[in-house]
Amino acid sequence: MSNLEQAERIKNLTKDHHNWMKNSLNLIASENITSRAVREAVASDLSHRYAEGLPGERLYEGCDYIDAIEEETIALSKKLYDAEHVNVQPTSGVVANLASFFALTKPGDLLMSINVPEGGHISHASVSAAGIRGLKISSVPMDDSIMNVDIDKTLSKIREKEPKAIVLGGSLFLFPQPVSEVADVAKEVGAKIIYDAAHVLGLIAGKRFQDPVKEGADIVTGSTHKTFPGPQGGIILCKEEIGRKVDNCVFPGVVSNHHLHHMAALGVATAEMLEFGKDYANQTISNAKALAQALYERGFNVLCEDQGFTESHQVAMDVAKLGDVSKMAKTLQYNNIILNKNLLPWDDVNDSDNPSGIRMGTQELTHRGFKEDEMDQVAEFIKQVVMDKKDVKEDVTEFMQDYTTVHYAFDEGCEGYDYIEF
Protein backbone atom coordinates (compact mmCIF):
# COMPACT_ATOMS: atom_id res chain seq x y z
CA MET A 1 0.00 0.00 0.00
CA SER A 2 1.41 3.40 -0.99
CA ASN A 3 1.61 6.36 1.36
CA LEU A 4 -1.24 8.01 -0.54
CA GLU A 5 -3.34 4.88 -0.26
CA GLN A 6 -2.70 4.73 3.47
CA ALA A 7 -3.76 8.36 3.81
CA GLU A 8 -6.93 7.58 1.86
CA ARG A 9 -7.55 4.57 4.09
CA ILE A 10 -7.40 6.79 7.18
CA LYS A 11 -9.81 9.22 5.54
CA ASN A 12 -12.22 6.42 4.67
CA LEU A 13 -12.02 4.95 8.17
CA THR A 14 -12.90 8.37 9.54
CA LYS A 15 -15.88 8.55 7.20
CA ASP A 16 -16.95 5.10 8.36
CA HIS A 17 -16.73 6.31 11.95
CA HIS A 18 -18.98 9.29 11.15
CA ASN A 19 -21.54 7.00 9.57
CA TRP A 20 -21.45 4.58 12.51
CA MET A 21 -22.00 7.40 15.00
CA LYS A 22 -24.93 8.68 12.94
CA ASN A 23 -26.52 5.23 13.06
CA SER A 24 -25.86 4.62 16.76
CA LEU A 25 -27.45 5.36 20.11
CA ASN A 26 -24.45 6.93 21.81
CA LEU A 27 -24.94 6.90 25.57
CA ILE A 28 -21.31 7.48 26.56
CA ALA A 29 -21.61 9.98 29.41
CA SER A 30 -18.42 11.85 28.52
CA GLU A 31 -19.14 12.64 24.87
CA ASN A 32 -21.30 14.98 22.81
CA ILE A 33 -21.68 16.44 19.35
CA THR A 34 -21.14 20.07 18.41
CA SER A 35 -22.85 22.46 16.06
CA ARG A 36 -21.48 23.17 12.59
CA ALA A 37 -20.33 26.60 13.79
CA VAL A 38 -18.18 24.96 16.46
CA ARG A 39 -16.81 22.45 13.96
CA GLU A 40 -15.91 25.28 11.57
CA ALA A 41 -13.82 26.97 14.26
CA VAL A 42 -12.00 23.69 14.96
CA ALA A 43 -11.19 23.41 11.23
CA SER A 44 -9.89 27.00 10.98
CA ASP A 45 -6.34 28.27 10.41
CA LEU A 46 -6.02 28.61 14.18
CA SER A 47 -5.20 24.90 14.23
CA HIS A 48 -1.86 25.83 12.66
CA ARG A 49 -0.91 28.59 15.11
CA TYR A 50 0.85 29.08 18.44
CA ALA A 51 0.25 31.47 21.31
CA GLU A 52 2.09 31.17 24.61
CA GLY A 53 1.05 33.29 27.57
CA LEU A 54 -2.01 35.44 28.25
CA PRO A 55 -3.64 37.90 25.83
CA GLY A 56 -1.42 40.98 25.56
CA GLU A 57 1.51 39.09 27.09
CA ARG A 58 2.34 36.61 24.31
CA LEU A 59 5.79 35.24 23.67
CA TYR A 60 4.97 34.96 19.95
CA GLU A 61 4.14 37.64 17.40
CA GLY A 62 1.13 37.27 15.12
CA CYS A 63 -1.41 36.96 17.94
CA ASP A 64 -3.55 40.08 17.48
CA TYR A 65 -6.69 38.23 16.40
CA ILE A 66 -5.92 35.33 18.73
CA ASP A 67 -5.83 37.76 21.66
CA ALA A 68 -9.21 39.17 20.66
CA ILE A 69 -10.71 35.68 20.34
CA GLU A 70 -9.41 34.59 23.73
CA GLU A 71 -10.59 37.78 25.44
CA GLU A 72 -14.05 37.32 23.91
CA THR A 73 -14.17 33.66 24.98
CA ILE A 74 -13.18 34.58 28.54
CA ALA A 75 -15.82 37.33 28.67
CA LEU A 76 -18.53 34.96 27.43
CA SER A 77 -17.47 32.35 29.99
CA LYS A 78 -17.55 34.85 32.85
CA LYS A 79 -21.06 35.80 31.80
CA LEU A 80 -22.24 32.21 31.46
CA TYR A 81 -20.93 31.04 34.84
CA ASP A 82 -21.03 34.38 36.67
CA ALA A 83 -17.38 33.73 37.52
CA GLU A 84 -14.81 36.23 38.75
CA HIS A 85 -11.89 34.69 36.85
CA VAL A 86 -11.75 32.23 33.95
CA ASN A 87 -8.86 30.45 32.25
CA VAL A 88 -9.69 28.80 28.93
CA GLN A 89 -6.22 27.41 28.20
CA PRO A 90 -6.25 23.89 29.74
CA THR A 91 -6.19 21.31 26.97
CA SER A 92 -8.32 18.84 28.95
CA GLY A 93 -10.16 18.45 32.22
CA VAL A 94 -7.25 16.47 33.67
CA VAL A 95 -4.84 19.28 32.74
CA ALA A 96 -7.21 21.72 34.47
CA ASN A 97 -7.14 19.51 37.57
CA LEU A 98 -3.35 19.28 37.48
CA ALA A 99 -3.00 23.07 37.22
CA SER A 100 -5.38 23.43 40.18
CA PHE A 101 -3.31 21.02 42.26
CA PHE A 102 -0.20 23.05 41.45
CA ALA A 103 -1.99 26.27 42.39
CA LEU A 104 -3.34 25.14 45.76
CA THR A 105 -0.93 22.48 47.05
CA LYS A 106 2.70 21.46 47.31
CA PRO A 107 4.26 17.98 47.25
CA GLY A 108 3.51 16.03 50.41
CA ASP A 109 0.25 17.84 51.14
CA LEU A 110 -2.88 15.84 51.92
CA LEU A 111 -5.69 15.81 49.37
CA MET A 112 -9.12 14.39 50.17
CA SER A 113 -10.94 13.01 47.14
CA ILE A 114 -13.61 10.48 46.23
CA ASN A 115 -12.48 6.92 45.47
CA VAL A 116 -12.85 5.90 41.83
CA PRO A 117 -15.39 3.07 42.42
CA GLU A 118 -17.53 5.52 44.40
CA GLY A 119 -17.59 8.02 41.55
CA GLY A 120 -14.29 9.86 41.74
CA HIS A 121 -12.10 10.48 38.71
CA ILE A 122 -8.75 8.83 38.23
CA SER A 123 -7.03 12.24 38.08
CA HIS A 124 -7.92 12.70 41.76
CA ALA A 125 -5.92 9.58 42.63
CA SER A 126 -2.26 8.85 43.29
CA VAL A 127 -1.86 7.08 39.93
CA SER A 128 -2.72 10.23 37.98
CA ALA A 129 -2.62 14.02 38.33
CA ALA A 130 -2.75 14.08 42.14
CA GLY A 131 0.17 11.67 42.25
CA ILE A 132 2.12 13.71 39.70
CA ARG A 133 1.86 16.64 42.11
CA GLY A 134 3.16 14.36 44.88
CA LEU A 135 0.04 14.57 47.02
CA LYS A 136 -0.98 12.16 49.73
CA ILE A 137 -4.54 10.92 49.24
CA SER A 138 -7.28 10.29 51.77
CA SER A 139 -10.79 9.34 50.69
CA VAL A 140 -13.91 11.46 51.06
CA PRO A 141 -16.41 9.24 52.93
CA MET A 142 -19.38 8.35 50.75
CA ASP A 143 -22.85 7.03 51.45
CA ASP A 144 -23.13 4.41 48.73
CA SER A 145 -26.87 4.00 49.27
CA ILE A 146 -27.45 7.54 47.97
CA MET A 147 -24.38 7.78 45.70
CA ASN A 148 -23.30 10.95 47.44
CA VAL A 149 -21.00 12.35 50.09
CA ASP A 150 -21.62 11.21 53.66
CA ILE A 151 -21.78 14.69 55.11
CA ASP A 152 -21.31 13.90 58.81
CA LYS A 153 -18.37 11.54 58.27
CA THR A 154 -16.76 13.89 55.77
CA LEU A 155 -16.95 16.95 58.00
CA SER A 156 -15.54 14.94 60.89
CA LYS A 157 -12.68 13.65 58.74
CA ILE A 158 -11.83 17.14 57.48
CA ARG A 159 -11.49 18.36 61.05
CA GLU A 160 -9.41 15.31 61.95
CA LYS A 161 -7.09 15.18 58.93
CA GLU A 162 -6.86 18.91 58.11
CA PRO A 163 -6.22 18.39 54.38
CA LYS A 164 -4.71 21.09 52.20
CA ALA A 165 -7.40 20.62 49.55
CA ILE A 166 -10.61 18.67 48.99
CA VAL A 167 -11.89 17.54 45.60
CA LEU A 168 -15.61 17.15 45.01
CA GLY A 169 -17.24 16.07 41.78
CA GLY A 170 -16.24 13.09 39.69
CA SER A 171 -17.04 10.78 36.82
CA LEU A 172 -20.06 8.88 38.18
CA PHE A 173 -22.07 11.91 39.18
CA LEU A 174 -25.80 11.45 39.69
CA PHE A 175 -26.61 14.21 42.19
CA PRO A 176 -25.35 17.62 43.32
CA GLN A 177 -22.87 17.34 46.17
CA PRO A 178 -22.82 19.28 49.48
CA VAL A 179 -20.32 21.97 48.49
CA SER A 180 -21.47 24.65 50.92
CA GLU A 181 -21.43 22.32 53.93
CA VAL A 182 -17.94 21.06 53.09
CA ALA A 183 -16.67 24.57 52.32
CA ASP A 184 -17.74 25.89 55.72
CA VAL A 185 -15.69 23.27 57.56
CA ALA A 186 -12.82 23.48 55.07
CA LYS A 187 -12.38 27.13 56.02
CA GLU A 188 -11.97 26.11 59.66
CA VAL A 189 -8.85 24.09 58.83
CA GLY A 190 -7.55 26.24 55.97
CA ALA A 191 -8.43 23.76 53.23
CA LYS A 192 -9.38 24.73 49.67
CA ILE A 193 -12.23 23.22 47.65
CA ILE A 194 -11.71 22.05 44.07
CA TYR A 195 -14.93 21.06 42.30
CA ASP A 196 -14.43 18.83 39.27
CA ALA A 197 -17.34 19.74 37.01
CA ALA A 198 -16.07 17.84 33.98
CA HIS A 199 -19.26 15.82 33.60
CA VAL A 200 -21.79 18.43 34.67
CA LEU A 201 -20.35 21.67 33.26
CA GLY A 202 -23.12 21.99 30.69
CA LEU A 203 -25.78 21.44 33.36
CA ILE A 204 -24.16 24.10 35.55
CA ALA A 205 -24.07 26.42 32.53
CA GLY A 206 -27.77 25.73 32.00
CA LYS A 207 -28.56 26.59 35.64
CA ARG A 208 -29.95 23.10 36.25
CA PHE A 209 -27.48 21.45 38.59
CA GLN A 210 -25.72 23.37 41.34
CA ASP A 211 -23.57 26.50 41.36
CA PRO A 212 -20.30 25.38 42.97
CA VAL A 213 -18.72 28.83 42.69
CA LYS A 214 -21.55 30.42 44.67
CA GLU A 215 -21.60 27.50 47.11
CA GLY A 216 -17.99 28.02 48.13
CA ALA A 217 -15.64 26.17 45.79
CA ASP A 218 -12.32 27.97 45.40
CA ILE A 219 -11.71 26.44 41.98
CA VAL A 220 -14.08 24.78 39.51
CA THR A 221 -12.50 22.71 36.75
CA GLY A 222 -14.32 21.31 33.77
CA SER A 223 -14.21 19.55 30.43
CA THR A 224 -15.72 21.44 27.53
CA HIS A 225 -16.97 18.43 25.57
CA LYS A 226 -19.22 16.33 27.82
CA THR A 227 -22.51 17.87 28.90
CA PHE A 228 -20.97 21.10 27.66
CA PRO A 229 -21.30 20.66 23.87
CA GLY A 230 -18.02 22.20 22.81
CA PRO A 231 -14.62 21.12 21.53
CA GLN A 232 -12.25 18.83 23.40
CA GLY A 233 -10.61 20.89 26.13
CA GLY A 234 -10.70 22.14 29.70
CA ILE A 235 -11.59 25.27 31.64
CA ILE A 236 -10.95 26.70 35.11
CA LEU A 237 -13.25 29.05 37.03
CA CYS A 238 -11.98 30.60 40.24
CA LYS A 239 -12.03 33.56 42.57
CA GLU A 240 -10.16 36.65 41.40
CA GLU A 241 -7.80 36.54 44.37
CA ILE A 242 -6.17 33.34 43.11
CA GLY A 243 -6.67 34.01 39.40
CA ARG A 244 -3.12 35.04 38.58
CA LYS A 245 -1.72 32.08 40.48
CA VAL A 246 -3.99 29.73 38.55
CA ASP A 247 -2.98 31.36 35.26
CA ASN A 248 0.71 30.87 36.07
CA CYS A 249 0.11 27.22 36.90
CA VAL A 250 -1.58 26.72 33.54
CA PHE A 251 1.15 28.58 31.62
CA PRO A 252 4.02 27.99 31.92
CA GLY A 253 3.05 25.28 34.41
CA VAL A 254 1.26 22.55 32.46
CA VAL A 255 0.33 24.07 29.08
CA SER A 256 2.45 25.65 26.35
CA ASN A 257 0.31 26.36 23.29
CA HIS A 258 -3.34 25.92 24.20
CA HIS A 259 -4.85 24.60 20.94
CA LEU A 260 -6.21 27.87 19.58
CA HIS A 261 -8.77 26.31 17.25
CA HIS A 262 -10.40 24.65 20.25
CA MET A 263 -10.35 27.93 22.15
CA ALA A 264 -12.22 29.71 19.35
CA ALA A 265 -14.67 26.82 19.13
CA LEU A 266 -15.20 27.08 22.89
CA GLY A 267 -16.14 30.73 22.47
CA VAL A 268 -18.77 29.82 19.87
CA ALA A 269 -20.13 26.98 22.01
CA THR A 270 -20.29 29.29 25.04
CA ALA A 271 -22.34 31.82 23.07
CA GLU A 272 -24.68 28.99 22.07
CA MET A 273 -25.03 27.90 25.69
CA LEU A 274 -25.90 31.45 26.73
CA GLU A 275 -28.69 31.28 24.15
CA PHE A 276 -29.91 27.68 24.46
CA GLY A 277 -28.26 26.24 27.58
CA LYS A 278 -31.23 26.31 29.93
CA ASP A 279 -33.53 24.43 27.56
CA TYR A 280 -30.78 21.96 26.69
CA ALA A 281 -29.89 21.25 30.32
CA ASN A 282 -33.55 20.87 31.32
CA GLN A 283 -34.18 18.37 28.54
CA THR A 284 -30.97 16.46 29.21
CA ILE A 285 -31.93 15.85 32.84
CA SER A 286 -35.57 15.10 31.97
CA ASN A 287 -34.34 12.56 29.44
CA ALA A 288 -32.05 10.92 32.01
CA LYS A 289 -34.93 10.59 34.45
CA ALA A 290 -37.18 9.17 31.74
CA LEU A 291 -34.54 6.66 30.63
CA ALA A 292 -33.93 5.54 34.21
CA GLN A 293 -37.64 5.08 34.87
CA ALA A 294 -38.15 3.16 31.63
CA LEU A 295 -35.25 0.83 32.40
CA TYR A 296 -36.47 0.33 35.98
CA GLU A 297 -39.95 -0.59 34.73
CA ARG A 298 -38.36 -3.20 32.46
CA GLY A 299 -36.69 -4.91 35.40
CA PHE A 300 -33.23 -3.37 35.45
CA ASN A 301 -31.56 -2.57 38.77
CA VAL A 302 -31.25 1.19 38.24
CA LEU A 303 -29.48 2.87 41.14
CA CYS A 304 -31.15 5.35 43.50
CA GLU A 305 -34.79 4.67 42.62
CA ASP A 306 -35.93 6.20 45.92
CA GLN A 307 -34.19 9.47 45.00
CA GLY A 308 -35.65 9.72 41.53
CA PHE A 309 -32.64 7.92 40.00
CA THR A 310 -30.67 11.01 38.94
CA GLU A 311 -30.48 14.79 38.84
CA SER A 312 -27.81 14.86 36.13
CA HIS A 313 -27.35 13.50 32.62
CA GLN A 314 -26.22 10.14 33.97
CA VAL A 315 -28.02 6.89 34.68
CA ALA A 316 -26.30 4.01 36.48
CA MET A 317 -27.35 0.35 36.68
CA ASP A 318 -26.01 -2.69 38.49
CA VAL A 319 -26.29 -5.46 35.91
CA ALA A 320 -23.87 -8.01 37.39
CA LYS A 321 -26.69 -10.51 37.96
CA LEU A 322 -27.51 -10.44 34.24
CA GLY A 323 -24.15 -11.80 33.13
CA ASP A 324 -20.64 -10.74 32.20
CA VAL A 325 -20.84 -6.93 32.08
CA SER A 326 -17.88 -6.53 29.75
CA LYS A 327 -19.44 -8.90 27.21
CA MET A 328 -22.78 -7.15 27.70
CA ALA A 329 -21.28 -3.79 26.75
CA LYS A 330 -19.67 -5.31 23.66
CA THR A 331 -22.95 -6.95 22.62
CA LEU A 332 -24.76 -3.65 22.99
CA GLN A 333 -22.09 -1.99 20.88
CA TYR A 334 -22.56 -4.59 18.16
CA ASN A 335 -26.21 -3.51 18.14
CA ASN A 336 -25.21 0.17 17.76
CA ILE A 337 -25.96 0.96 21.41
CA ILE A 338 -22.79 2.50 22.78
CA LEU A 339 -22.28 2.90 26.52
CA ASN A 340 -19.62 1.95 29.03
CA LYS A 341 -19.14 -0.60 31.75
CA ASN A 342 -18.41 1.17 35.01
CA LEU A 343 -17.15 0.47 38.51
CA LEU A 344 -19.73 0.79 41.27
CA PRO A 345 -18.99 1.47 44.95
CA TRP A 346 -19.10 -2.23 45.87
CA ASP A 347 -16.55 -3.17 43.17
CA ASP A 348 -12.83 -3.55 43.74
CA VAL A 349 -10.89 -0.83 41.92
CA ASN A 350 -8.93 -3.56 40.12
CA ASP A 351 -12.11 -4.97 38.54
CA SER A 352 -12.45 -2.20 35.97
CA ASP A 353 -12.29 -4.72 33.10
CA ASN A 354 -15.45 -6.44 34.33
CA PRO A 355 -17.26 -4.34 36.92
CA SER A 356 -20.85 -4.51 38.13
CA GLY A 357 -22.17 -1.40 36.51
CA ILE A 358 -23.21 0.32 33.34
CA ARG A 359 -23.12 4.11 33.06
CA MET A 360 -25.17 6.04 30.52
CA GLY A 361 -25.53 9.70 29.61
CA THR A 362 -28.33 11.41 27.70
CA GLN A 363 -26.54 14.59 26.59
CA GLU A 364 -25.67 13.59 23.02
CA LEU A 365 -29.09 12.11 22.30
CA THR A 366 -30.64 15.28 23.70
CA HIS A 367 -28.48 17.32 21.34
CA ARG A 368 -29.92 15.18 18.53
CA GLY A 369 -33.48 16.09 19.49
CA PHE A 370 -34.47 13.17 21.73
CA LYS A 371 -37.16 13.75 24.34
CA GLU A 372 -38.87 11.58 26.93
CA ASP A 373 -40.80 9.38 24.49
CA GLU A 374 -37.61 8.47 22.64
CA MET A 375 -36.00 7.48 25.93
CA ASP A 376 -38.63 4.80 26.37
CA GLN A 377 -37.62 3.32 23.02
CA VAL A 378 -33.95 3.46 24.03
CA ALA A 379 -34.78 1.46 27.15
CA GLU A 380 -36.71 -1.05 25.06
CA PHE A 381 -33.76 -1.56 22.71
CA ILE A 382 -31.45 -2.15 25.70
CA LYS A 383 -33.89 -4.66 27.18
CA GLN A 384 -34.21 -6.52 23.89
CA VAL A 385 -30.45 -6.94 23.67
CA VAL A 386 -29.60 -7.66 27.32
CA MET A 387 -32.64 -9.60 28.52
CA ASP A 388 -34.29 -10.92 25.36
CA LYS A 389 -31.01 -11.67 23.53
CA LYS A 390 -32.31 -10.11 20.32
CA ASP A 391 -30.37 -8.52 17.48
CA VAL A 392 -31.69 -4.97 17.06
CA LYS A 393 -28.88 -3.41 15.02
CA GLU A 394 -31.02 -2.79 11.95
CA ASP A 395 -33.89 -1.46 14.07
CA VAL A 396 -31.58 0.96 15.88
CA THR A 397 -30.04 2.14 12.62
CA GLU A 398 -33.46 2.78 11.09
CA PHE A 399 -34.68 4.55 14.24
CA MET A 400 -31.70 6.91 14.30
CA GLN A 401 -32.29 8.23 10.78
CA ASP A 402 -34.86 10.68 12.15
CA TYR A 403 -32.31 12.14 14.59
CA THR A 404 -29.23 13.12 12.62
CA THR A 405 -29.31 16.91 13.10
CA VAL A 406 -28.07 19.17 15.88
CA HIS A 407 -30.49 20.99 18.20
CA TYR A 408 -29.90 23.80 20.73
CA ALA A 409 -27.54 25.63 18.35
CA PHE A 410 -27.53 28.77 16.19
CA ASP A 411 -27.46 26.56 13.10
CA GLU A 412 -30.14 24.21 14.41
CA GLY A 413 -31.08 21.55 11.93
CA CYS A 414 -27.60 21.13 10.47
CA GLU A 415 -26.33 17.59 10.06
CA GLY A 416 -24.38 16.47 13.09
CA TYR A 417 -22.41 13.57 11.62
CA ASP A 418 -21.57 14.54 8.06
CA TYR A 419 -17.91 14.36 7.08
CA ILE A 420 -16.81 17.85 6.07
CA GLU A 421 -14.51 17.81 3.03
CA PHE A 422 -12.49 20.75 1.74
From Swiss-Prot:
CDD domains, sorted: SHMT
Lineage: Archaea, Methanobacteriati, Methanobacteriota, Methanomada group, Methanobacteria
The keyword Cytoplasm is annotated on this UniProt entry: yes
Subcellular location: Cytoplasm
Predominant cellular place of this UniProt entry's protein: cytoplasm
Source organism per UniProt: Methanosphaera stadtmanae (strain ATCC 43021 / DSM 3091 / JCM 11832 / MCB-3)
Entries under Pfam families matching the protein: SHMT
Protein name: Serine hydroxymethyltransferase
UniProt site (Plays an important role in substrate specificity): H225
Residues bound to (6S)-5,6,7,8-tetrahydrofolate: G120, H121, I122, E241
NCBIfam families linked: PRK00011.1 (NF000586)
UniProt keywords, alphabetically: Amino-acid biosynthesis, Cytoplasm, One-carbon metabolism, Pyridoxal phosphate, Transferase
Known partners and oligomeric status: Homodimer.
Enzyme class: transferase
UniProt modified residues of type N6-(pyridoxal phosphate)lysine: K226
